[in-house]
């Protein structure tokens, strides 16, 4: 009550914002005569003047009135179109990091040119985001003449474009593209192996068209780049053949023991290790199978993956037993859960182990699609420094825009008053009665010459209506969002007298339905039309336009209510553009999904009490209110789901940003030798500590285990036991220092063979490749954790907190694994000639190219888990700042340890 009184006195927040902006509109209007006096050259020179003023420290807000006045005057000269005052307000809203709700037909595309120009003056790039490729191309080409007149470059970012073309598109002042492509390019840039492979600049300003569709409807849809693992089934089969030739020995080879076998097994760690004898035999057998060349070593850089295959095959034969660890059913290897004994359909072991077991069991070897990178739209768009959007329907979702994206919604008034008649809903008992009533309504209105747009919630429903219209002999067009270019043509002509068009809710968004049809489309069919022909077409169109207005304008028929009021409002918004006449009505039945689930009992009882007969409809404000309440319930539930998903996904997002920041830092430096030395020290300290605990008695030392570990994991022959026997004074610290120094000397000798430059490149390549590999495995592990985390609720634990805690532990473990695997790989690679390193780099490049060709870009509807304030991309993290991964530790004590 009090709030209502205050609102009446002071106006709503929306009213106050519009009042403030109208003052700026007055300033722009006063500048108009001054701009009209300028020559084209003087008007174009304003762009350079604005840029100079920005460099001198003037703010964009100060420049706004002049910049908008320049764009308006340029638009008059280039397009013959003048921005309305409400479009200037829309442009200001978009510049202020807000959502502008502008009704259909109010000229959102022209409005967007204002903030796009203003923000492009910074030289940091403006990304205009559309829902499909057709609209991106259309808007870019339509607005290109205006921007180029003003001295700005325009780029189009489309799927399938080569990297140089994409780089050029992103280098433009204003880039048009789809939400999918911007997101995928971000992910691909964070998989690049050199700075030159990246295409995007730092993310500055995103202007999102149909913002409700992208930031709300698709919020639960992660962008996923998955690479089908290379088809190496033949290799698995060939390697599998050599395993029966190998003999097991009980103990690992050491200084005091040399067995006759070819491999030993560590049951506890579930690992297998080849002996020297085994290595020689495996190499011989691989040469015999034609997998390896004569004289090659299994440990040479180019054969690292082959060694991986041999180890996987050995583990499959020795450590994994049929009907214990797995079963074979219908030609498929299915894992058995070791704790429950239940089969785990759909789960697969990673690292090629599952394929090795399939080769062992002689069943079809399946390739796996591995998730290499993923991000949700929610988290991608929060990376932009400035984010704004526009749509015809945002007010119903204003709370979600505010709470998740920190974006306020401002309803921009229409240029002319809206006079569309929104008729009350009609509710029927059955679906068939409803369809019959719709057909009758269409018959009556099309005879009068009124155009009709029938909106359905699915392609299936549109086919039902289409079939009924065919049966009634009514000519019509069907749209179902498959062919965007053709769709726009049909929508443009849907305003012809008596035209009947069926469309799914999203089809044709972005294209206005012009009453009387589009005269521009008719002109486009003529070759080199002259002014007289254009005038004739316009005159004929004016007659048709007036006739359609007289018939009542465009009539919208909704065949059922959508879960979201916003989608219903979008459908209604196709009619009544720019103050035109129009009408709308929704036809419902008790068999509709929404009515059946949420409103059935109350409305059914009401209909029964009224004694309704077949074919009769109920039309009452109570019914409309009951339906609106049902929709609010669904919207609230969907919002809660999206909010909860975002809370979970923010954990992964913090980790993603940490990894991508480190990855980009790695890419941008040529020498990471200091980092390698630092993590080598950490790795050797941790390794030695696990066998020689700090400040422990010698009786507690496992010297033999340490020697084996150094040999197996780092290819270092160090007689630690002999040193201790010969030098009794050798204590824990001096021993640790000696091992580290000897490891360093061995590494430096390798470096002398190939040269420091080649070694630096190799270190960087190994670091990037290992990081990518572990991140990929971490994504899969996070996914598995997320799928089962809700069960913690039964143990009276908060699943969100448990997920955060465990995922951080997994992240910390991944960083430790990264250090260990990088040092292990660099230590084990046997380098003889610089050419071998180059061969490995070439192999890596070929693998990256293969992946780029095979990349499957998939939109995967998933309850992926994701809120929070907008992430400020590229802020330098101080060493004493809180770690961005959410652990609560300082950066230097968490994943910043890699930056030592």
Curated annotation (Swiss-Prot):
Region described as Disordered: spans on this chain: 842-900
Biological process annotations from GO: intracellular protein transmembrane transport; protein import; protein targeting; protein transport by the Sec complex
Comment on bound cofactor: May bind 1 zinc ion per subunit.
SMART domains the UniProt entry points to: SecA_DEAD, SecA_PP_bind
Names of required cofactors: Zn(2+)
UniProt key word ATP-binding: yes
Localization (cell): Cell inner membrane; Cytoplasm
UniProt induction comment: Repressed under conditions of excess protein secretion capacity and derepressed when protein secretion becomes limiting. This is regulated by SecM.
Biased composition (Basic and acidic residues): 842-852
Residue spans of biased composition, Basic residues class: 889-900
Transmembrane segments: none
Record carries keyword Transcription regulation: no
Any GO CC annotation of this UniProt entry: cell envelope Sec protein transport complex
Residues annotated as binding Zn(2+): 883, 885, 894-895
Subunit structure: Monomer and homodimer. Part of the essential Sec protein translocation apparatus which comprises SecA, SecYEG and auxiliary proteins SecDF-YajC and YidC.
Protein name: Protein translocase subunit SecA
Species of the source: Pectobacterium carotovorum subsp. carotovorum (strain PC1)
């Amino acid at each position: 009550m009090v709030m209502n009184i205050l609102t009446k006195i002071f106006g709503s927040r929306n009213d106050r914002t519009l009042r403030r902006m109208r003052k700026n509109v007055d300033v722009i209007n006063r500048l108009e005569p001054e701009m009209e006096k300028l020559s084209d050259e003087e008007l174009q020179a304003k762009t350079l003047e604005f840029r100079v003023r920005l460099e001198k420290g003037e703010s964009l807000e100060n420049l706004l009135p002049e910049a908008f006045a320049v764009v308006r005057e340029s638009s008059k000269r280039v397009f013959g179109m003048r921005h309305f005052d409400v479009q200037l307000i829309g442009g200001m809203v978009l510049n202020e990091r807000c959502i502008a709700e502008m009704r259909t037909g109010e000229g959102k595309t022209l409005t967007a040119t204002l903030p796009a120009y203003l923000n492009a003056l910074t030289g940091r790039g403006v990304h205009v985001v559309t829902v499909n490729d057709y609209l991106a191309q259309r808007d870019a080409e339509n607005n290109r003449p205006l921007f180029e007149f003003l001295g700005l470059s325009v780029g189009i970012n489309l799927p399938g474009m080569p990297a140089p073309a994409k780089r050029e598109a992103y280098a433009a002042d204003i880039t048009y593209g789809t939400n999918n492509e911007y997101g995928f390019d971000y992910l691909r840039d964070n998989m690049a192996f050199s700075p030159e492979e990246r295409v995007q600049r730092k993310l500055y300003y995103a202007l999102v068209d149909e913002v409700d569709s992208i930031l709300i409807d698709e919020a639960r849809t992660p962008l996923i780049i998955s690479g089908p693992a290379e088809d190496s089934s033949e290799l698995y089969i060939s390697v599998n053949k050599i395993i029966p030739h190998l003999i097991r020995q009980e103990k690992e080879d050491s200084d005091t023991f040399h067995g006759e076998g070819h491999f030993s097994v560590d049951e506890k760690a579930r690992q297998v290790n080849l002996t020297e004898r085994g290595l020689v035999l495996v190499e011989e057998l691989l040469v015999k199978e034609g997998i390896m060349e004569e004289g090659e070593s299994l440990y040479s850089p180019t054969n690292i993956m082959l060694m991986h295959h041999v180890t996987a095959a050995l583990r499959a034969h020795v450590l994994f037993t049929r009907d214990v660890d797995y079963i074979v059913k219908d030609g498929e290897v299915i894992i058995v859960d070791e704790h429950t004994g239940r089969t785990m359909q759909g789960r697969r072991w990673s690292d090629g182990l599952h394929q090795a077991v399939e080769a062992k069991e002689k069943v079809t070897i399946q390739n796996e699609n591995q998730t290499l990178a993923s991000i949700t739209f929610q988290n991608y768009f929060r990376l932009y420094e400035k984010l704004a959007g526009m749509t015809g329907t945002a007010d119903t979702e204003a709370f979600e825009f505010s709470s998740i994206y920190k974006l306020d919604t401002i309803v921009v008034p229409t240029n002319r008053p809206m006079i569309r008649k929104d008729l009350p809903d009609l509710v029927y008992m059955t679906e068939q009665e409803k369809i019959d009533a719709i057909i009758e309504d269409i018959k009556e209105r099309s005879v009068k010459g009124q155009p009709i747009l029938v909106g359905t919630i699915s392609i299936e429903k549109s086919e039902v209506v289409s079939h009924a219209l065919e049966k009634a002999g009514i000519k019509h067009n069907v749209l179902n969002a498959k062919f965007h270019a053709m769709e726009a043509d049909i929508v443009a002509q849907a305003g012809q007298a008596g035209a009947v068009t069926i469309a799914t809710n999203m089809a044709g968004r972005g294209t206005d339905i012009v009453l009387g049809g589009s005269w521009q489309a008719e002109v486009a069919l003529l070759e080199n039309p002259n002014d007289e022909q254009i005038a004739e077409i316009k005159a004929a169109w004016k007659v048709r336009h007036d006739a359609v207005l007289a018939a009542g304008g465009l009539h919208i028929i909704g065949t059922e209510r959508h879960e979201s009021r916003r989608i219903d409002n979008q459908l209604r918004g196709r009619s009544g553009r720019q103050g035109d006449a129009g009408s709308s009505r929704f036809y419902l039945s008790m068999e509709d999904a929404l009515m059946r689930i949420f409103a059935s009992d109350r409305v059914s009882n009401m209909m029964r009490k009224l004694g309704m007969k077949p074919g009769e409809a109920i039309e009452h404000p109570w019914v409309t209110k009951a339906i609106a309440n049902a929709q609010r319930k669904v919207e609230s539930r969907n919002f809660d789901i999206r909010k909860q998903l975002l809370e979970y996904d923010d954990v992964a997002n913090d980790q993603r940003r940490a990894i991508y920041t480190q990855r980009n830092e790695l890419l941008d430096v040529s020498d990471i030798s200091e980092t390698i030395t630092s993590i080598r020290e950490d790795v050797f300290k941790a390794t030695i500590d696990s066998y020689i605990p700090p400040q422990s008695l010698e009786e507690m030392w496992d010297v033999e285990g340490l020697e084996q570990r150094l040999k197996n994991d780092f290819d270092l022959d160090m007689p630690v036991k002999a040193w201790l026997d010969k030098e009794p004074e050798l204590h824990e610290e001096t021993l640790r220092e000696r091992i580290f120094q000897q490891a360093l000397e061995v590494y430096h000798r390798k470096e002398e063979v190939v040269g420091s430059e080649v070694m630096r490149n190799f270190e960087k390549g190994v670091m990037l490749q290992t990081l990518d590999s572990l991140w990929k495995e971490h994504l899969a592990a996070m996914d598995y954790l997320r799928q089962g985390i809700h069960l913690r609720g039964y143990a009276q634990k908060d699943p969100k907190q448990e997920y955060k805690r465990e995922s951080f532990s997994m992240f910390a473990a991944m960083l430790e694994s990264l250090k260990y695997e990088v040092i292990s790989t660099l230590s084990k690679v046997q380098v003889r000639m610089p050419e071998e390193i180059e061969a490995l780099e070439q192999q890596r490049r070929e693998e990256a190219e293969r992946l780029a060709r095979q990349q499957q870009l998939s939109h995967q509807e998933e309850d992926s888990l994701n809120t929070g304030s907008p992430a400020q991309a590229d802020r330098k993290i101080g060493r004493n700042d809180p770690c961005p991964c959410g652990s609560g530790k300082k950066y230097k004590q968490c994943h910043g340890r890699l930056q030592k």
